[in-house]
Curated annotation (Swiss-Prot):
Top EC class, one word: transferase
NCBIfam families in alphabetical order: lipid_A_lpxA (TIGR01852), PRK05289.1 (NF003657)
Protein name according to UniProt: Acyl-[acyl-carrier-protein]--UDP-N-acetylglucosamine O-acyltransferase
Annotated PROSITE patterns: HEXAPEP_TRANSFERASES
Reactions it catalyzes: a (3R)-hydroxyacyl-[ACP] + UDP-N-acetyl-alpha-D-glucosamine = a UDP-3-O-[(3R)-3-hydroxyacyl]-N-acetyl-alpha-D-glucosamine + holo-[ACP]
Keyword DNA-binding: no
Family: Belongs to the transferase hexapeptide repeat family. LpxA subfamily.
Function description: Involved in the biosynthesis of lipid A, a phosphorylated glycolipid that anchors the lipopolysaccharide to the outer membrane of the cell.
PANTHER family (alphabetical): ACYL-[ACYL-CARRIER-PROTEIN]--UDP-N-ACETYLGLUCOSAMINE O-ACYLTRANSFERASE (PTHR43480), ACYL-[ACYL-CARRIER-PROTEIN]--UDP-N-ACETYLGLUCOSAMINE O-ACYLTRANSFERASE, MITOCHONDRIAL-RELATED (PTHR43480:SF1)
One GO cellular component term: cytoplasm
Record organism: Blochmanniella floridana
Pathway(s) the chain acts in: Glycolipid biosynthesis; lipid IV(A) biosynthesis; lipid IV(A) from (3R)-3-hydroxytetradecanoyl-[acyl-carrier-protein] and UDP-N-acetyl-alpha-D-glucosamine: step 1/6
InterPro entries documented for this protein: Acetyltransf_C, Acetyltransf_C_sf, Hexapep, Hexapep_transf_CS, Lipid_A_LpxA, Trimer_LpxA-like_sf
Length: 262
């Protein structure tokens, strides 16, 4: 179903069954598969493939040569009905690839709202991306990677499969991430390691002075106290009773499976 207010260039192919909502603009030479749904006011520039079971929200901008919802690169994939979900207000720049999920990973690759994926970003199967993230040119995420809100990943960085990246993290360009990165941290290198806190980012996002001081204390517990991760977790839980923001560290350490960068 194509809404009457949608604009579709005559050179584009939209298979029967696709749902195109109001004021969507599909530019020239695009292909949209039968199981795709595209939300209102989303713009597809040109030469874009959207395939598989793919749901795209409202007010997204998708640039030329992007490929969304294609078969993933997991050799175990056997044509199961897995999918991708993309939220609202995302900018997906040239040649970005986002692959559908696998049955082993929850069946969905999921993108939140208001993210910017620059040229040639690759988001593999089963990745879960939060809101307000920025991934610079040529960032590559392996399968099952989770990236929390307000994370910035520098260009040419690769993130190993199953890694977890916390909220408000900044990763420098050309890094190789092989372990989990706790929230609020600046990381860089191959293999990536911690280089302090993303203080400037926290200030820009309105964190109070007391919250920033508490986060500094949490960083010292995690990285300068010679505690084990479990020992640090106990100390962080105690600190969180006075400063609830520290629960982000506690929750992250609970979720972490690959160990944290240290």
């Amino acid at each position: 179903m194509i809404n009457r207010s949608a604009i579709v260039h005559p050179s584009s192919i939209i298979e029967e069954g696709a749902i195109i909502h109001s004021d969507v603009h599909v530019g020239p030479f695009c292909f949209i598969g039968a199981q795709v749904e595209i939300g209102a006011r989303t713009l597809l520039k040109s030469h874009i493939v959207v395939n598989g079971i793919t749901q795209i929200g409202e007010d997204n901008q998708i640039y030329q040569f992007a490929s969304l919802g294609e078969v993933n690169q997991d050799l175990k994939y056997a044509k199961e009905p897995t999918r991708i979900e993309i939220g609202n207000y995302n900018q997906i720049r040239e040649s970005v690839t986002i692959h559908r999920g696998t049955v082993q990973g929850g069946q969905v690759t999921k993108i939140g709202n208001s993210n910017l994926f620059m040229i040639n970003v690759h988001i593999a199967h089963d990745c879960i991306i939060g809101n307000n993230c920025i991934m610079a040119n040529n960032v590559t995420l392996g399968g099952h990677v989770k990236v929390d809100d307000y994370t910035i990943i520098g260009g040419m960085t690769a993130v190993h499969q199953f890694c977890l990246v916390g909220s408000h993290v900044m990763i420098g360009g050309c890094s190789g991430v092989v372990q989990d990165i706790p929230p609020f941290i600046i990381a860089q290198g191959n293999h990536a390691t911690q280089f302090g806190l993303n203080i400037e980012g926290l200030k820009r996002r309105g964190f109070s002075r007391s919250a920033v001081h508490a986060i500094r204390d949490a960083y010292k517990i995690l990285y300068r106290s010679n505690k084990t991760v479990e020992g640090a977790k106990v100390a962080l839980k105690l600190l969180s009773t006075e400063h609830p923001i520290i629960n982000e560290f506690v929750d992250f350490l609970t979720r972490s499976q690959r160990g944290i960068i240290r």
